[in-house]
């Protein structure tokens, strides 16, 4: 029987800030297995052509590593994006650890110096021209999906521009290897963000929740705001599958 903490969670799980780009191959495999093989998330599948091939993993890891190496800092010197990994002892390699969960937390704000500003050109910011070279329709579709997904997030960021604390802390992505789900790993990744937001001055936390993740988020104090997120896409793409997502937030002063 694995050792557990008093809370009943597996004590072999470690949550650590990623410090080397080499980790992103395993991180990308976790995302692939959770969003691709398990959830069949339509937006993930469309934005990651070849996601289930070795080449697709290399491309995905490269994009994540590029974001990692270009992280900006706020006016307090804190990174505006933090990449987390959850590791457990590798069952196939004694003495080594294996990445089985990941999260990206981002500080965002409409005010310079208080966090990354929401992107003005999604095709450029997401590198969609390199993902879909010469295919403007697919570039527009991916941008429309992400723009719709983050619409309420960006409205809240704009609303906070005149607040005493104009920044928010956003869960940009969270995934756990399907073989290691149900062990409290997602909860630990989210709790790290709650603690970090408090350390950064009590920032409000925002996220877009899939059907799989929302029960974890609600237990940790996130509340749904508004109805299901609607995707505003061109008619030619209306038939495509897109995942259920809702906008959730903690409220001010967390």
Each predicted region: which residue ranges?
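A short beta-loop-alpha structural element at the N-terminal edge
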Residues: 14-41
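Active-site rim helix/loop that mediates acceptor-substrate recognition in acyltransferases
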Residues: 45-83, 87-94, 158
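Conserved acyl-donor/pantetheine-binding loop and adjacent beta-alpha core of acyl/acetyltransferases
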Residues: 71-75, 93-175, 181, 229-241, ...
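Conserved GNAT-family N-acetyltransferase fold
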Residues: 84, 103, 174, 207, ...
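Conserved GNAT acetyl-CoA-binding A-motif
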Residues: 169, 197-209
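Conserved acetyl-CoA-binding loop-helix of GNAT-fold acetyltransferases
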Residues: 176, 182-195, 219
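Residue-level recognition of the GNAT/N-acetyltransferase active site
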Residues: 177, 210
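Conserved active-site alpha-helix within GNAT-family acetyltransferase domains
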Residues: 187, 199-200, 211-231
């Amino acid at each position: 029987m694995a050792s557990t903490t008093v809370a009943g969670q597996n004590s072999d799980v470690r949550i650590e800030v990623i410090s080397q780009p080499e980790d992103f191959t395993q991180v990308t495999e976790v995302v692939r297995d959770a969003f691709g093989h398990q959830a069949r998330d339509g937006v993930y599948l469309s934005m990651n052509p070849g996601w289930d091939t070795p080449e697709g993993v290399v491309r995905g890891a490269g994009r994540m590593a590029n974001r990692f190496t270009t992280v900006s800092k706020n006016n307090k010197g804190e990174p505006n994006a933090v990449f987390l990994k959850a590791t457990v002892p590798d069952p196939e390699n004694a003495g080594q650890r294996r990445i089985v969960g990941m999260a990206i937390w981002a500080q965002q704000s409409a005010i310079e110096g208080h966090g990354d500003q929401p992107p003005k050109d999604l095709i450029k910011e997401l590198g969609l021209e390199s993902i879909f070279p010469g295919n403007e329709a697919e570039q527009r579709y991916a941008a429309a999906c992400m723009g719709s997904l983050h619409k309420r997030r960006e409205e809240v960021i704009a609303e906070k521009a005149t607040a005493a604390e104009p920044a928010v802390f956003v869960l940009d992505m969270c995934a756990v290897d399907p073989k290691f789900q149900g062990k409290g790993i997602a909860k630990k990744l989210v709790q790290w963000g709650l603690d970090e937001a408090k350390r950064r001055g009590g920032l409000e936390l925002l996220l877009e929740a899939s059907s799989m993740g929302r029960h974890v988020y609600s237990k940790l104090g996130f509340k749904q705001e508004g109805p299901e997120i609607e995707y505003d896409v061109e008619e030619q793409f209306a038939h495509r599958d897109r995942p259920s997502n809702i906008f959730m937030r903690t409220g001010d002063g967390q």
